[in-house]
Amino acid sequence: MSGTTGERPFSDIVTSIRYWVIHSITIPMLFVAGWLFVSTGLAYDVFGTPRPDEYYTQERLELPILKDRYNTDQQIQEFNK
């Protein structure tokens, strides 16, 4: 026979008013915080990814694909010109 762990049953937690008062505020705030993180551009700065308008320059409009795996340094320098 199994014993009890002393924790509250999940059904009691989900049906409590306190649970829904707390989570009705925190869950939407997580989505708002994520939206602000991305929409302000902070995500680009934190993770170091280029912004959508920085992928292509006026001089280079083709995809920067490396074709020769042994001369990658030279190819990257050509892409950065």
From Swiss-Prot:
Mode of membrane association: Single-pass membrane protein
Single GO cellular component term: plasma membrane-derived thylakoid membrane
Binding site for heme: 23
Assigned keywords, A-Z: Electron transport, Heme, Iron, Membrane, Metal-binding, Photosynthesis, Photosystem II, Thylakoid, Transmembrane, Transmembrane helix, Transport
Location within or outside the cell: Cellular thylakoid membrane
Transmembrane annotation, as ranges: 21-35
GO biological-process terms attached to the record: photosynthetic electron transport chain
Binding note for cofactor: With its partner (PsbF) binds heme. PSII binds additional chlorophylls, carotenoids and specific lipids.
PANTHER family assigned: CYTOCHROME B559 SUBUNIT BETA-RELATED
Identification of the protein by name: Cytochrome b559 subunit alpha
Organism expressing this protein natively: Gloeothece citriformis (strain PCC 7424) (Cyanothece sp. (strain PCC 7424))
Gene label: psbE
